[in-house]
Amino acid sequence: KELAAFVGKDEALCFSTGFTVNSGVIPALTDRNDYIICDDRDHASIVDGRRLSFSQQLKYKHNDMADLEKQLQKCNPDSVKLIIVDGVFSMEGDLANLPEIVRLKHKYNATIMVDEAHGLGVFGKQGRGVCDHFGLTHEIDLIMGTFSKSLASIGGFIAADSSIINWLRHNARTYIFSASNTP
């Protein structure tokens, strides 16, 4: 509860690593009729998570919001559209254009998941991440984070509303079939 409150969400679910968060959460949230839309420079754990899903996968050019919109236009309007983006891109060090991604979320009825692995502890008030930095925490559906960067520990988490966390608790295979975190 404290971790979820820190990043501005109802609940959080802890995993053994940050990598297992993305590789388990992404396939648990989508199925064959859904779309995953990712920045082409997203972290390897996001790439593997989308590969493990059976959803239709679309990539947009790095931080190119016109291309993101072009990819969203390809989606069936009645299907789930999950936009997944790094808050801070680990190789480039630049920030996702969250204000524009949120605008497109509303225009195309999409869901947003932000990987805060490199933003947590650095950006936002008291290190709450890039979502907080832009004042958009309430607009972001899922916030992922890791303990292995600024928090200097082991493990990862996903934070969202209670219904999403409950779904993931019972459907994210990397949570169900993995070892628990170290104390």
Which residue ranges define each predicted feature?
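Short, structured coil segments at secondary-structure junctions
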Residues: 32, 52-54, 108, 139
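Conserved Walker B
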Residues: 41, 88, 117-118
